[in-house]
């Protein structure tokens, strides 16, 4: 593939609006975890899309929210910094005629950076009367008149994604290929595996418990004789009571989380996986700067 142009695009928006789903849909494979709980994404994730002579590098970001911990501060910092040194911002919003505080803050930041902005109205597959999208468009145009394009789309069904890529291609700059062919994300395999385990906790556990967890891969190796991947994972939680809930009666919850994670990890790795999981208590880790840094969330 002869790549002659590149475009760095930040995908931003409030929590749970579908940023990771959109990134996964454009990349064509699952590189970012998805759940129905806010603040699923904690770090900036690069997704790579090659189309014709253009390489798109999508920056999937945490949802903008009011932080309640050092980790939350870090996540908000990631969002703000992701709007620097990119060609365009794709602002993802719900299909409702209301511009909330997160959208206003992001639009202000986009304006400060003098960034081209594409308004992406996601989840149109949930809209019964398509003419109601005109009210959404009017609400955003009233707040911000600088959108280069407004594109209704659905990350779930794929509607509007080709139109979005055609628009994003207009921001591509001449330059060398940033990521080699076949590379769809900047994340190491072990990072993706850890995130998959965290995704399963978000889906299996209720309320705030999964938000107080961190996942660390302590062993990642491939057996020479069989190609089986040995994966040891430690789940950190903030309270002893949470540890009991994560493990569950007779270890049933941890088995459920591990089994679901192993299936997705095997699909991602294309190999059999022997997964072992442990749960440890690390009190108030979200406000512990040293531990946060050890988990790859660099506050510098």
Report residues per predicted region:
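Conserved glycine(s) of the Walker
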Residues: 18, 160, 253
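Solvent-exposed alpha-helical segments within well-ordered globular domains of core cellular machineries
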Residues: 10, 24, 43, 47, ...
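Canonical P-loop GTPase G-domain recognition
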Residues: 116-118, 125-185, 189
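Conserved G1/Walker A P-loop phosphate-binding module
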Residues: 1-88, 93
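Conserved C-terminal guanine-recognition region of P-loop GTPase G domains, centered on the G4
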Residues: 50-55, 77-150, 221-225
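Conserved, well-folded catalytic cores of nucleic-acid-processing
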Residues: 29, 48-52, 67, 82, ...
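Catalytic P-loop NTPase motifs of RecA-like helicase/translocase cores
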Residues: 41, 65-66, 98-99, 127-128, ...
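P-loop NTP-binding site
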Residues: 189-300
């Amino acid at each position: 593939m002869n790549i002659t142009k590149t475009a760095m695009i930040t995908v931003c928006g409030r929590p749970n609006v579908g940023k990771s789903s959109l990134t996964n849909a454009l990349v064509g494979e699952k590189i970012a975890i998805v759940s129905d709980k806010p603040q699923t994404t904690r770090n900036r994730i690069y997704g790579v899309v090659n189309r014709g002579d253009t390489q798109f590098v999508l920056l999937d970001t945490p949802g903008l929210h009011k932080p309640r911990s050092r980790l939350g501060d870090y996540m908000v910092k990631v969002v703000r910094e992701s709007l620097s040194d990119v060609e365009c911002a794709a602002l993802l919003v719900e299909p409702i005629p209301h511009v909330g505080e997160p959208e206003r803050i992001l639009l202000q930041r986009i304006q400060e950076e003098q960034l081209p902005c594409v308004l992406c109205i996601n989840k149109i597959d949930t809209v019964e009367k398509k003419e109601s999208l005109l009210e959404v468009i009017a609400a955003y145009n009233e707040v911000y008149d600088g959108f280069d394009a407004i594109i209704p789309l659905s990350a779930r069904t794929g509607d509007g994604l080709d139109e979005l890529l055609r628009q994003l291609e207009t921001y591509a700059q001449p330059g060398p290929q940033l990521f080699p062919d076949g590379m769809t994300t900047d994340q190491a395999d072990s990072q993706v595996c850890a995130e998959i385990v965290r995704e399963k906790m978000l889906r299996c556990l209720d309320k705030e418990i999964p938000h107080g967890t961190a996942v660390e891969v302590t062993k990642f190796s491939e057996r020479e004789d069989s190609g089986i991947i040995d994966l040891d994972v430690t789940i950190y939680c903030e309270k002893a009571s949470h540890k009991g809930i994560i493990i569950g009666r007779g270890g049933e919850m941890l088995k459920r989380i591990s089994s679901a994670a192993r299936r997705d990890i095997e699909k991602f790795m294309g190999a059999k996986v022997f997964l072992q999981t442990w749960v440890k208590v690390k009190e108030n880790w979200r406000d512990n700067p040293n531990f946060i840094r050890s988990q790859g969330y660099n506050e510098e």
